């Protein structure tokens, strides 16, 4: 009798049929039960399917020419840098596909094509990286190198960079492990000199060493809530071997290092040193030796085999950026006013003046939006309430503040 009562009270998994004494735990649902073993099996099936989906997406990576075509829709100028990035990104994801499909007996080990982008503020480094990630539909995260500190010091651990990527990937580890991370302002953590310092370098060489580990490929322990690690915290294991790292910085003054090197070599051969007018010409001549002299450790340089030098944008470049890309600023403001049934026009001289202001402020393309915001503030405030206005024309005088925009009414 007691045995039958016990069987009546026994709970069974609705999927595998095991009872509560045969498994660690059984979870009750609406008219159904599931044991911990079936939960683990379901998680494994889902994980495998997600990996297959990620690999399937990456198997259709656009060719370099196709990537360049995509970049040209959004990014003006920087043709050499765009070509270098297109090739590096294509080779990176081709390497992943090759690694996942090759036979175990093959001994070819393709190294990662991590990228170092060097160029002045506002030249498009971050935007290039963002556009590439968007075109490939892979998770993308941005980190500021100046916020990072060596382990044991107050500040942000390098592992928190990986946490940002995980968050963008909705904590899908497999997707995150094939994402792109852009580390900005790497030049700001350069060593102060080529000589090894006796004192601790909290935000310089120590951070470079910490970055080196995750850039070259390692299994990192990432705190899911961010912040500092502590023994009681459960960690997420992230393998960085297939994460593409794009590292960028302005490297102000590196052209002087290039000039010095080129001058010494020319004199050594008994030739006259030919002066180059623009610093951008020197930027195209940068080699690993110059970057090391600037203060980046040679081990980190070795893990960034692709150099992409971006040039200072000219007034003509900035004017094209204002009106040509698919998401150009002029098009954005025209769209905003169109919602109020108002057309917006910029005179050519107005666009030139906006570009000139950005050059004067040394903000490059990054500063264009703030200049347009200043110019358009009164228009955006007043025009929506003026029902008879049908067209707004922005002139050079509007931009330099000497006159108001021209309004045409119905």
Swiss-Prot record:
<dbReference type="GO" id="GO:0046983">
    <property type="term" value="F:protein dimerization activity"/>
</dbReference>
<keyword id="KW-0547">Nucleotide-binding</keyword>
<dbReference type="GO" id="GO:0008270">
    <property type="term" value="F:zinc ion binding"/>
</dbReference>
<feature type="binding site">
    <location>
        <position position="13"/>
    </location>
    <ligand>
        <name>Zn(2+)</name>
    </ligand>
</feature>
<dbReference type="GO" id="GO:0140662">
    <property type="term" value="F:ATP-dependent protein folding chaperone"/>
</dbReference>
<dbReference type="InterPro" id="IPR003959">
    <property type="entry name" value="ATPase_AAA_core"/>
</dbReference>
<keyword id="KW-0143">Chaperone</keyword>
<feature type="binding site">
    <location>
        <begin position="120"/>
        <end position="127"/>
    </location>
    <ligand>
        <name>ATP</name>
    </ligand>
</feature>
<comment type="subunit">
    <text>Component of the ClpX-ClpP complex. Forms a hexameric ring that, in the presence of ATP, binds to fourteen ClpP subunits assembled into a disk-like structure with a central cavity, resembling the structure of eukaryotic proteasomes.</text>
</comment>
<dbReference type="Pfam" id="PF10431">
    <property type="entry name" value="ClpB_D2-small"/>
</dbReference>
<feature type="domain" description="ClpX-type ZB">
    <location>
        <begin position="1"/>
        <end position="54"/>
    </location>
</feature>
<dbReference type="InterPro" id="IPR046425">
    <property type="entry name" value="ClpX_bact"/>
</dbReference>
<feature type="binding site">
    <location>
        <position position="35"/>
    </location>
    <ligand>
        <name>Zn(2+)</name>
    </ligand>
</feature>
<dbReference type="InterPro" id="IPR027417">
    <property type="entry name" value="P-loop_NTPase"/>
</dbReference>
<keyword id="KW-0862">Zinc</keyword>
<dbReference type="InterPro" id="IPR003593">
    <property type="entry name" value="AAA+_ATPase"/>
</dbReference>
<dbReference type="InterPro" id="IPR004487">
    <property type="entry name" value="Clp_protease_ATP-bd_su_ClpX"/>
</dbReference>
<feature type="binding site">
    <location>
        <position position="38"/>
    </location>
    <ligand>
        <name>Zn(2+)</name>
    </ligand>
</feature>
<dbReference type="GO" id="GO:0016887">
    <property type="term" value="F:ATP hydrolysis activity"/>
</dbReference>
<keyword id="KW-0479">Metal-binding</keyword>
<comment type="similarity">
    <text>Belongs to the ClpX chaperone family.</text>
</comment>
<dbReference type="GO" id="GO:0051603">
    <property type="term" value="P:proteolysis involved in protein catabolic process"/>
</dbReference>
<feature type="binding site">
    <location>
        <position position="16"/>
    </location>
    <ligand>
        <name>Zn(2+)</name>
    </ligand>
</feature>
<comment type="function">
    <text>ATP-dependent specificity component of the Clp protease. It directs the protease to specific substrates. Can perform chaperone functions in the absence of ClpP.</text>
</comment>
<protein>
    <recommendedName>
        <fullName>ATP-dependent Clp protease ATP-binding subunit ClpX</fullName>
    </recommendedName>
</protein>
<dbReference type="Pfam" id="PF06689">
    <property type="entry name" value="zf-C4_ClpX"/>
</dbReference>
<dbReference type="GO" id="GO:0051301">
    <property type="term" value="P:cell division"/>
</dbReference>
<dbReference type="GO" id="GO:0005524">
    <property type="term" value="F:ATP binding"/>
</dbReference>
<dbReference type="InterPro" id="IPR019489">
    <property type="entry name" value="Clp_ATPase_C"/>
</dbReference>
<dbReference type="Pfam" id="PF07724">
    <property type="entry name" value="AAA_2"/>
</dbReference>
<keyword id="KW-0067">ATP-binding</keyword>
<dbReference type="GO" id="GO:0009376">
    <property type="term" value="C:HslUV protease complex"/>
</dbReference>
<dbReference type="InterPro" id="IPR010603">
    <property type="entry name" value="Znf_CppX_C4"/>
</dbReference>
<dbReference type="InterPro" id="IPR038366">
    <property type="entry name" value="Znf_CppX_C4_sf"/>
</dbReference>
<dbReference type="GO" id="GO:0051082">
    <property type="term" value="F:unfolded protein binding"/>
</dbReference>
<dbReference type="InterPro" id="IPR050052">
    <property type="entry name" value="ATP-dep_Clp_protease_ClpX"/>
</dbReference>
């Amino acid at each position: 009798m007691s045995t039958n009562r016990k069987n009546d009270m026994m709970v069974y998994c609705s999927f595998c049929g095991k009872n509560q004494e045969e498994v660690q735990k059984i979870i009750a649902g609406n008219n159904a039960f599931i044991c911990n073993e079936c939960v683990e099996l379901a998680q494994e099936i889902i994980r495998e399917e997600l990996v297959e989906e990620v690999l399937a997406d990456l198997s259709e990576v656009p060719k370099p020419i196709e990537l360049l075509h995509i970049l040209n829709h959004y990014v003006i100028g920087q043709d050499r840098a765009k070509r270098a990035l297109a090739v590096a990104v294509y080779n990176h994801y081709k390497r992943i596909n090759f690694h996942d499909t090759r036979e175990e007996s093959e001994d070819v080990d393709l190294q990662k094509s991590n990228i170092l982008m060097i160029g002045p503020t506002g030249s498009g480094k971050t935007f290039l990286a963002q556009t590439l990630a968007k075109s490939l539909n892979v998770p993308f995260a941005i980190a500021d190198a100046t916020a990072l500190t060596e382990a044991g010091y107050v500040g942000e651990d390098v592992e928190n960079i990986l946490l940002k990527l995980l968050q963008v990937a909705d904590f899908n580890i497999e997707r995150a492990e094939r994402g792109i991370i852009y580390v900005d302002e790497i030049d700001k953590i350069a060593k102060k000199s080529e000589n090894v310092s006796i004192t601790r370098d909290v935000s310089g060489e120590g951070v470079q060493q910490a970055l080196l580990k995750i850039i070259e490929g390692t299994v990192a322990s990432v705190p899911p809530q961010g912040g500092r690690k502590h023994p009681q915290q459960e960690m997420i294991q992230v393998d960085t071997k297939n994460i593409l790292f794009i590292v960028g910085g302005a490297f102000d003054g590196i052209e002087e290092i290039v000039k010095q090197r080129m001058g010494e070599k020319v004199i050594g051969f008994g030739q006259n040193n030919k002066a180059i007018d623009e610093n951008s010409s020197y930027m195209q001549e940068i080699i690993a030796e110059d970057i090391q002299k600037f203060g980046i450790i040679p081990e980190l340089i070795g893990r960034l085999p692709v150099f992409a030098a971006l040039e200072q944008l000219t007034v003509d470049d900035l004017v094209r950026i204002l009106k040509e890309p698919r998401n150009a600023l002029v098009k954005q403001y025209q769209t905003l006013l169109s919602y109020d049934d108002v057309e917006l026009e910029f005179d050519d001289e107005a666009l030139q003046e906006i570009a000139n202001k950005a050059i004067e402020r040394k903000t490059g393309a990054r500063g264009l939006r703030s200049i347009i915001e200043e110019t358009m503030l009164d228009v955006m405030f007043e025009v929506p309430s003026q029902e008879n206005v049908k067209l707004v024309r922005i002139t050079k005088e509007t931009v330099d503040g000497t006159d108001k925009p021209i309004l045409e009414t119905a």
